[in-house]
Amino acid sequence: MGRLPIAGKAPILTRLMKTLTIAARFCGPAASSNGGYFAGLVATLASRTLAVRLLKPPPLDTELAVRDLEDGTLQVVHAEEAIGEARPAVLTLDAKPPPDYLEAVEASRRYAGFRYHRFPSCFVCGTRRVRGDGLRIFAGPMPERGVVAAPWVPDASLDRGDDKVRPEFMSAALDCPGYYAVAPDDRMMLLAEFTAHVDRLVHIGESCTLVGWQIGSSGRKHEAGTAIFDGRGELCGKARALWIEPRSSGESRA
């Protein structure tokens, strides 16, 4: 989904950690990365749970430097400009219980993106992405449960090499259902911060279920929780996201 352009002041850096490049396949908007995928790449690089703050849209097919700052923050940089920052985090979040797989299939038929989609090429939830290319996670409402839900069967292109889904794709899958949990009316929102924790990688070809729910709202800020469950209904990963509605052009900044 969309990304939040907000200015950030960088702490003093200590060393260059590594570089990463986001392939065009993994876009959210057409010209920038899906936020959950970006966050997952950074967390995988660091091998720990991180709260990833998106400062600018992460560019595609471009080498990005990852810097380790002296305060423990990781900073992702392009052309000396901070794209994102990440800090170590402990994710405290009680996951909503999942529907069964067939209930999730039924919910996905009510996916709002079938009527209108701001980013139809999104790697995670885009309706123009074909099987084997996009994740095609179409989270539809289940009002009786207070969640949105979607089925997901990971394809072979997501394989880590051991018949399990790579962790950055688990993180990506946990992104967009949160948007549809907090924006059922398809209002414009931008992802500001994303914290994902993966307990266990799901298998390629496994019939998984995703749920998303609203945690709370305050003005333009909306928090969402998401979770992914394996074919046995066991929790495998979860995420907490902060989504922000952009100010209208005439709105005061006070």
Segments from the language model and where they lie:
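Ser/Thr/Pro/Gly-rich low-complexity, intrinsically disordered segments
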Residues: 1-4
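Non-catalytic linker/capping segments at the edges of enzyme domains
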Residues: 7-19, 71-162
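Intrinsic-disorder/low-complexity, polar/charged segments enriched in Ser/Thr/Lys/Arg/Asp/Glu/Gln
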Residues: 15-19, 49, 145-149, 193, ...
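Hydrophobic beta-strand-centered segment that forms part of the acyl-chain substrate-binding groove
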Residues: 26, 30-33, 38-65, 69-70, ...
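Residue-level detector of beta-strand face positions
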Residues: 51, 73-77, 223-227
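Short, conserved beta-turn/loop elements at beta-strand boundaries and strand-helix junctions
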Residues: 70-74, 217-220
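A mid-sequence, solvent-exposed acidic-amphipathic segment
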Residues: 135-199
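Accessory, usually C-terminal, subdomains that scaffold auxiliary metal cofactors
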Residues: 196-253
